[in-house]
From Swiss-Prot:
Name this polypeptide is given: Trypsin inhibitor A
Subcellular location, principal: secreted
Keywords: Disulfide bond, Knottin, Protease inhibitor, Secreted, Serine protease inhibitor
The protein's role, per its UniProt record: Inhibits trypsin.
UniProt remark on domains: The presence of a 'disulfide through disulfide knot' structurally defines this protein as a knottin.
GO cellular component, one term: extracellular region
Disulphide-bonded residues: C3-C20, C10-C22, C16-C27
Alphabetized Gene3D superfamilies for the sequence: 4.10.75.20
Location(s), subcellular: Secreted
Lineage summary: Eukaryota, Viridiplantae, Streptophyta, Embryophyta, Tracheophyta
Keyword Lyase: no
Pfam families: Squash
InterPro entries xrefs: Prot_inh_squash, Proteinase_amylase_inhib_sf
């Protein structure tokens, strides 16, 4: 899978883009 905003800081999955989830404060 590809995540266009990997490593971006986040507090919840919705802070990331499609196919991304928030893991340990970063999108992945």
């Amino acid at each position: 899978r590809s995540c266009p905003r990997i490593w971006m800081e986040c507090t919840r999955d919705s802070d990331c883009m499609a196919k991304c989830i928030c893991v340990a404060g970063h999108c992945g």
